[in-house]
Each structure stands twice: as C-alpha cells, then as structure tokens.
Amino acid sequence: MPITPLSRYEETSFWARSYGAYRPGAPLTGDATVDVAIIGGGFTGLSTALEFKRDNPGATVAVLEGAVVGYGASGRNGGFNMKLFGLEPEVTKLRWGRERTIAAHRYAQRAVAWVKKRIEDNRLESDYRHTGMFRVSYSPAQHERLKRTYHLMQELGIDDAVSVWSADQLRAEFKTDRYLGAMYEQETGILNPCKHVRELKRLAVEKGVVVYEQTPVELISRPGDKVRLQTPHGAVTATKLVVATNAYTRALKGLPELRSRQLPMWTFQVVTAPLTTEQWDSIGWKNQQSFEDNRQLVHYFRPTVDGRITMGGGDITTPSDDSFDHDYAPRIWSHCEEHLKWIFPQLRDVQFEYRWGGPVSVNLDMTPEIGLLGDERVIYSTGCIGHGVSLTHLNGRLIADLLGGKKTELTDFWIVNRKAVPWPPEPVSFLGRHAIHQGLKLWDYWQERKLPRDRTRTE
C-alpha cells in the first residue's frame, strides 16, 4: 500500500487509520506571545507542555505542530513502552562506562513506569497493556550475545524483572521452532501510539496549553532576549523555546547548531488482517507479549487489541538527501511479511492490510541527548534511536525542570548538555552511514546463514 499524500494524515500509519476521524486543532493565524513555545506535537513536545503547565498554571504555553498530532514518529512507531536506552548495555558501557550505564538503565526503567502511571492516573485511552517483552535469538551466535547481555546486566545489578527463557519454554508458549532462547523483561508494555499521543494532546489542551496544528515553523530567529517563530500565517514570540522535532530537526531553519546533531533514518512496518480464533490458537501467544529479536537490524513485533500482528524493522533506509519523502519501501515491507511467516509457518495464508514507514532520530554516538543552546533560551532533545516511547515522556519532565530553572535529580542526568558527536558533512556522512548499514546487514547474514528456510536476510 503506497504511503498517501500528506493531505491524508489518517493514512500515514495503521494506528492513524484505525483511529478514525480526527479533527486537528486550528492553525496559527496572526501573532502570539507566550512564555514557552514548543515545536513538535509528539510525545516529547506534549509531555513537556503538560509537565511545565502543571508546574506553572499561569504560564502561557504553545505547541506548534507542522502537520497534525500523530503524524510524526509518535503516531507511527511500534508502541513499545520499553527499557532500552540507546543500543544494548554492552555498547553503552563501552562508550560511557559502568556508572553511566547503570544510570541510563535506571532512567529508562523510571520512564517505563512514568508512562504507565500517567496513563492510569489520567485514564488515557491508549490501549495500554503491561504484558512484558521478549528479546529472542534465532541462531547460536545471536544466543551467545544474548547471554552476554544478560550476564552484564547481572554484573551491573540491572537484571531486576528480567529472566532467561529456554527454547523449550518458548516453544510451549508460542508454538514455533524458530526461537533458540530469549530474555524476558516483565516490566514493559505496548500501546497504540497514535491514540496515546492524541490523548496527551487532549490532556494538554484541558490544562490550558494551546496546540496549533498544520503550523510548520518556517524560520527561527532570536531577536533581543526572545525567540521568534515565523509560520505561514503568523508568528509566535516566546521567552523560551523547546525543539521537540527529533527526526525532523534537520528541516528547521534558523538553528544551524542542531543540523548535525542527529540524522533521520527510516524504519518500516506492516500489520496483518485480524487473525481468526483458529490462527491465534495455532501460534499460542496467549499473553500478548511484545518481541524484539537479537539481530543488529532488529525486528519488532506485537499483537494489537483488535487481534492483528504488527511486524517492523529488519532493515532501514539511510537517504542521501534532505527530503522526508522516504516512507515507501516495498522491499522492506515484503521482508517483514515473509519474516512473520518464517517465525509462524501456520500464518502462511495471513493477509497484510497496512504498510507504512517513517523516520527516527539517530545521533552518531547512538545515545539520546538533551541540551541547551547558547544563552539557554533554546532547549532541544534528539536521538532516541527508535526506542523513544518511554524516554520521551520522562524527557518531558526533565525539560520542564530545565525550563523552570530547577536543579533536580533529572536535570543532573548525564545526557543533559553532553554535546553529541556531530555527523560529518555530506557526502562523507552518507558514505559512512551506508558502510555501517551494509556492515550490519552482513553481520546478520553471517550469523543467520545456517538457519532453515532463512527468510531473515534482506537483499
């Protein structure tokens, strides 16, 4: 299914399509002056707006969303409320050391609980289920790496609520021979990301936040001690600005310092038609857990509340240009469909009804970053690397503290003002990304080359 034009926002993902009719907020017309302006109506932007407004009920806060709430990564992702910070803990420890790895895990752990509590406390209609997540291996080499990860987590004391499952246990639960072993993380969940982000918008508006939709920011300037955002039909002048555009940050004009902080890379998903009772019985999966595998180019898959299965990942695209017109990837969609059938041959006749894709924010050192620009009028957040459902919400609380000039346990977290390694200029950046991408594909191919009826490799 081709990705449809941007005028059809409801078609950008299965989640948006299943949401049904959506009435976006009015665009900005004329000029407005506020205390805090936030560019980006996703998880980061709306969470920041909510938290700052709770702290400062009398403050004026405006969120400017270029498309509609739910259009970007916050409405297109897999909906995994999970504890992964950046990449695996081995990578974090190698780059940042023992103590920062532990702190990062605790932050991610707190973020998962934060999302769950906010949904429960505010009765958000997010289709949330706290069912846990498996990290599975298909090959002996993948399983050895999985065991090393678990042993490191034990060594660091961050293995709470994590258990190891054998192939026999997995086979009994899921009726497939493909899983060689797994780590099971109990304290994780899944949600419908488009419903959830629009629930955050509803809550923010109820608290007095103004959300302008279909209001792209064309130019950012910093006159005097203010920040000015020019839009097609007006302008916002603010005392402070939060840049919460993540993967779309590269498109902003007026903040050249942020251009090389991160790059967008594209991931893709498919979703089945609702499975019949017989199909569900044939594969087990009675407890509705979510999955990631232990590849370099991971697959992520999960059930939906209406009885479907989503499957994403397996490969990415790293375009060489600055456009965001890269949501169409038939080869990767076909791979995702075949991979689900490879795991569950019982589903060889299952139909797929939706296919979509979108960009995620990737820093060169594969670590999230929150920072302040210059005189601290501008705060930015980038680099969740496709694992941002949980992190973005707690990041919103952290950014609200920064906006308020507070020094808290969160603002002391080591990613604040860490100054990410910048991506090099083009074409060096593209050539480097391409080489890394091909290396990861080769890694997965080599580790999976002896798998039976191997459909996990992308050409």
Say what each PLM segment does.
Residues M1-V36, R54-D55, A59-T60:
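Extreme N-terminal leader/targeting segments of oxidoreductases
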Residues P2-E11, R17, L87-K93, K117-T131, ...:
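Flavin (FAD/FMN) cofactor-binding and adjacent substrate-gating region
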Residues K53, H339, T392-D412:
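Internal hydrophobic alpha-helix adjacent to the cofactor/substrate pocket in enzyme cavities
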Residues K53-R76:
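Glycine-rich FAD pyrophosphate-binding loop
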Residues R76-Y107:
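Glycine-rich active-site loop/strand segments that organize a redox cofactor
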Residues A113, D121-R129, V217-L219, D225, ...:
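Active-site substrate-recognition segment that forms the wall
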Residues E144, L152-Q154, D177-K240:
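Helical element adjacent to the flavin cofactor pocket in flavoenzyme catalytic cores
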Residues V362, L402-I436:
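Active-site-proximal substrate-binding core of FAD-dependent oxidoreductases
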